[in-house]
Each structure stands twice: as structure tokens, then as C-alpha cells.
Amino acid sequence: MKYVSRSACEMRGALGGVIKEVELLSSLEHPFLVNLWFSFQDEEDLFMVCDLLTGGDLRYHLQNRVEFSEQSVALLVCELGSALEYLQAHRVVHRDIKPDNILLDDTGHAHLTDFNIATRLQKNSLACSMSGTKPYMAPEVFLCALDEVAGYSYPVDWWSLGVVAYEMRGNIRPFVVHSNTPLAEIKNILNTPVHYPRYWSSNFVDLLQKLLSTYPGARISTRQELHQTPMLRNIDFQMVLEKKIKPIYKPPEDHLNCDPCLELEEMIVESRPLHKKKKRLAKQRSAQRDSDPETALVKEFIVYNRYKELKRKAMEQKEHDWQRELELAMANSIVNSLTPIQEKPVASTVHDDDCVTAPSAAAQLKGGIIEFIDRTPSPQIKESASSTLNIPTRPFHK
């Protein structure tokens, strides 16, 4: 669960970014993203409940000097490449791909998180703000900041993925760039050739070179282009999506895959620790009993429930399937002709003078219009053996 202080966000002017992140995550779902399940708020904080991933972030494992093989790096590139292609289909640029924002599950599969500075592009538009972490930012982002290009697009995330892949294999980054490095100097650094150790395979180097191309048009930016590289030519991406390819590196299960100091800091240093929130809010609400609690909430922060969303989507799919079945049934049912109604003559023993018969259909058709056809059966009257009507009479008296 991720939670942020409303007051701290308002002081830093970051409240809009949190609201935007929740709106963005509520529209996304992918096997290699950290998916949002719930979002809610109280008087103090904004909460986001996401997938539980116990493997820790990639930065933690790099700091612990985990040696990732080329095969391990290649699988991570495939998994995150699938996530990037999904984001591109939804017009989303992440803009902050780095080891800190890549979480591992208990089996070692990678998941992308932290969409705080992500943006959704309009059709045929470019992003132009300088957003991200400098050591992982693509050359065109810096060129845009120097007003040398109009903007940048989805390939910036693939550059960042290439930097992460290089760092996983060599435990150093391909370029020496820091947060305080001037833009002009960064431009020169990124134009220098990248050094690849001799013991790295040619196929692995080829993959990194295509991810770290300084020209966005020549850079790998799709899953198909990944599949065309010699390193990943034999990878079954459908099995990758279904997580059927087992990662070589599995995070340890005997301890927390994170720095325990960070967990203790929240309990000791934090002025408003989460574990004391219930008691604290009870006092506040008691003191503000006469005020409207709704006025203390951020109206723009959406309340999201993925369970309800999945139920709604399932119902929509059922309705769509029913509609399609109905349309197919109607399209396949062809009426060749209509059989006219045949009237059967009704035998009657009543004299013609005693009843009025309805005109036949044929007679009505001669007139051009059938106004009404009476199909009520004629009354059946039983006759006596002598075929005479036995009507009782009474004597007539003058």
C-alpha cells in the first residue's frame, strides 16, 4: 500500500500529480505492471493499494551485488518491453524507468511501478517537459530542454530500459551522468561510444546497442523489433506474457527484500505514523463533530475498486456476446415465403336465414383490403330424431 500526506503534497504542489497517477493507473492492467486495486482517502492521507510484490525493487538487489546473467537480463527486457508496448498502445510514456521503479515478485518476474510523472500523449503529439532521472533519460529529452528538438515520444522509455539492462549486467551505468551534471556536458557524454566488456556475448551487445541508439528512429521501440534481434529470436513472447518462462534469479525468501531502516523510519521518525492513525483521527473527528467531513476530502481524487471494475467489464462482455449471438441468429434465419392462412368451412345445421356468415378471405381480397375476418365458430344445434325442433308451448287463454 502506498500513501501520501495530503498536506505535504499541497505544500510541494504535487497533489495534482498524485490525482493524475491514480486516474492513469485505474485505466491500465498488465502482467508486468504494478496494477492498482483500490484508492481511497481520509482527512490526512491519500491511499493506493496495488499488487503485493515481495521480491523487492531491482535497486536493492543491485546494491547487494547480485550478478545477473545475460539470460536473466534478456528475460527482464522481454517482460518490461511487453509492458512498454502495452503502455504505448494506451498512449502512455512512463518517463522514469530505473531500477528503483522495477519491482520483482517472489519468483523473480519484473513489474513496472511509479507513474507519478508519466504522461498520456494526444494523437500525433509529443512531450516536451524535462522529466525523469538524469542518468536514465534519453538524449532527445536533453535536446528538447536545449530547444534543439521539438519534443520526444515513446522511444525514451526504451532508452531507459537499455540503461537498466546494461547496469544489471555490469553493475555500472553506460554513461557517467549525475543529477547535477550540466545539460551541455550531458549532451557530449551521450555522444561518446559505449564501452562493452569483452566477455559479453556479441548477441547481448547487439541488443544493448539497438536499445541505446542515440537516434530515436533507429532505436528498438516495439516487441517485434526485440524479437528480431539474435539474442531474443527464439523467445516465445506469449509464454513471456503468461509468465511461463522461469527467471534464473529468484529473490530470497528468508528475509525482507528491502532496507529495514526504511520500515523503521516510518514508525520512529514519521510525525504521523500510520499505525496510530485510527486513534488520532478519532480525536480529530470528535473535535470537529459539527463540521461536514466531506469538505475535508479532495474531490478530484477518485475512489477506485478493481473488483467492481472487473465485474462491470465481465457483464459488458456478456451483453456484447449475447448481442452478437442474437445478430447471428437473425442473420441466419431467412424466411423464403409466407404461407397464406387456409380457412376451413364450418359445417352448420342452422338455416342460412337464421345466421349471418362472415365473408370469405377470397371475397375480401377481391375488394383489395381485408378489414376483419370473424373466425368465431358457428353455434352447433342438435336436432331431434325427426329433424324438428321440440319447442314447448303453453295454452293460450282469451
Locate predicted features:
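Activation segment signature within eukaryotic-like protein kinase domains
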Residues: 76-77
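Eukaryotic Ser/Thr kinase distal regulatory-tail detector
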Residues: 247-398
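Conserved N-lobe beta3->alphaC-helix segment of eukaryotic protein kinase catalytic domains
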Residues: 3-28
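Activation-segment/catalytic-loop signature of the eukaryotic protein kinase fold
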Residues: 39
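Conserved short submotifs of the Hanks-type protein kinase catalytic core
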Residues: 44-57, 61
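Terminal C-lobe "cap" of eukaryotic-type protein kinase domains
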Residues: 213-220, 224-245
